Amino acid sequence: MIRVNCMSDRLFELLDGSCLNEKQHEAFVLQTVSEDGWPHAAMISAGEIIALSRTDIRIALWKNTMTSANILRTGKAQFTAWWKGAAYYVKLECAPLPPLKDAEYERDRFSCRIVSVKEDVAKYADLTSGVRIQLHSPEEVLSRWKKTLEDLKR
């Protein structure tokens, strides 16, 4: 298990916003803490998170979700990703970004700084998958994701 405060080349490759067609089946778990102190989990896709650098990422969430409310309240989140034989647990400090008036898809957007990354691999077994999804309308969703990721860069 490796702990650092920036993402590895492999994790950056997953979150760099490129090759969405190849990453369309990947889903991640974004964890926050609810007002009553319980963990709250939500799934996000490769089209809702982008790494601007190895220490800074941005996340786009549907408006007015429990996850958004939790991040706004605490300024913290953790996401878990699985990619190329490893699990990644990434702790984030998050701040809201202003709304974009010309965004086609209105989202709650967050700028996040990585606090820590734990890369987890097992010596005795191969991690072969994490959360996998099958899009119902891939062309439509991939188009939306591309626009969302472009908006996150602004």
From Swiss-Prot:
Gene3D superfamilies: Electron Transport, Fmn-binding Protein, Chain A (2.30.110.10). InterPro entries: Split_barrel_FMN-bd (IPR012349). It comes from the Bacteria. This is Uncharacterized protein YclD. The lineage of its organism: Bacteria, Bacillati, Bacillota, Bacilli, Bacillales.
